[in-house]
């Protein structure tokens, strides 16, 4: 659980804030003995992280742009727990090209918006050691399967539609590892 969502014991569960309170992290880490800490700085699970009302429209692309992550909260947590591994749940970027492919081939993902990659790059350069992006892989897989079924409606062999899905997910993860998450070339370290 993110610390803003549910803390240890029923007396410390869910409150109204969507962000982690940096004043609570030392107590939480001490009481739980956790070896990493998922904090809330404006991320959320799924492909619908923000409402259209929370976003503004980029005039150059016509796409919705979400509000920035609360890096001041991340900085305050890092100050309270220097060097402690931080995790970000719900950090999918919701690649618009995958959303567009899904919608082109019969999907109905309206106003699906994620965390901009530049925000994730910034987080990856901090104490954040793990950034969860599962919705991105689901979108990549779904887009490839929908496209295959639309272009080859008689196809029923899973090897024929799961292969392109796997390839699309691999392409996505290579991009994220190399260009976004700062996880490439870590084996030598």
Stretches with model-predicted labels:
Residues 37, 89, 123:
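Conserved, mostly hydrophobic/aromatic
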């Amino acid at each position: 659980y993110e610390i803003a969502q549910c803390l240890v014991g029923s007396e410390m569960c869910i409150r109204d804030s969507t962000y982690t309170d940096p004043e609570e992290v030392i107590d939480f880490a001490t009481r739980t003995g956790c070896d990493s800490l998922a904090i809330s700085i404006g991320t959320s699970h799924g492909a619908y992280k923000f409402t259209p009302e929370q976003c503004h429209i980029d005039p150059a692309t016509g796409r919705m742009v979400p509000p920035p992550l609360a890096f001041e909260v991340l900085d305050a947590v890092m100050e309270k727990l220097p060097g402690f591994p931080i995790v970000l749940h719900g950090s999918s970027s919701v690649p618009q090209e995958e959303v567009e492919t899904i919608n082109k081939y019969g999907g109905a993902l309206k106003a699906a918006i994620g965390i901009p990659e530049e925000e994730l790059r910034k987080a990856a350069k901090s104490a954040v050691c793990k950034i969860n992006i599962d919705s991105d892989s689901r979108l990549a897989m779904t887009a490839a399967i929908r496209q295959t079924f639309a272009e080859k409606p008689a196809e029923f062999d899973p090897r024929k539609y799961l292969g392109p899905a796997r390839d699309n997910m691999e392409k996505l993860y290579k991009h994220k590892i190399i260009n976004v998450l700062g996880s490439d070339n870590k084996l030598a370290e």
